[in-house]
Amino acid sequence: MAESQTGGGGGGSHESGGDQSPRSLNVREQDRFLPIANISRIMKRGLPLNGKIAKDAKETMQECVSEFISFVTSEASDKCQREKRKTINGDDLLWAMATLGFEDYIDPLKVYLMRYREMEGDTKGSGKGGESSAKRDGQPSQVSQFSQVPQQGSFSQGPYGNSQGSNMMVQMPGTE
């Protein structure tokens, strides 16, 4: 994983075959990838307690996840540039995922984004803050630590990654 990328992947526009922008030329590996400890922790959630993950599997997943994030973010960034905006928001990412063919993930992510904004007090999606309607009405928001989201695609739920449940639990940010 220490070798540098010199071809089709680098986090740029997926149509250009790579990112040739000045900011991508001197990117360190630690800045390009999510921390391996985080990747490993997420991967272990789908294994039995005595399950092991090979180092190369963790590194491969680390690279794939980082490339996926760059792919979706690049599409959202292109949209924002066309609209002459500088900030990518959650709605832009959902649009990018739909555009790139990841429709099965849109509905659960919309629910997650809505509940996240409720917790953050942002109902407009602008990222500028503000109060949710429940707070304005003097009522506390009824967002639980875990939100049930309808299952989409082939996402597995069970502790061993093989159950066929119809819902998945999503931990909301800030409730750990």
Swiss-Prot record:
Annotated GO MF terms: DNA-binding transcription activator activity, RNA polymerase II-specific; DNA-binding transcription factor activity; protein heterodimerization activity; transcription cis-regulatory region binding
Biased composition (Low complexity): 139-159
Subunit field text: Heterotrimeric transcription factor composed of three components, NF-YA, NF-YB and NF-YC. NF-YB and NF-YC must interact and dimerize for NF-YA association and DNA binding.
Record protein name field: Nuclear transcription factor Y subunit B-10
SUPFAM superfamilies: Histone-fold
Tissue specificity: Expressed in the whole plant, except roots.
Cellular component terms per the entry's GO annotation: CCAAT-binding factor complex
Annotated region (Subunit association domain (SAD)), positions in chain: 61-72
Composition-biased stretches (Polar residues): 160-169
Organism the protein comes from: Arabidopsis thaliana
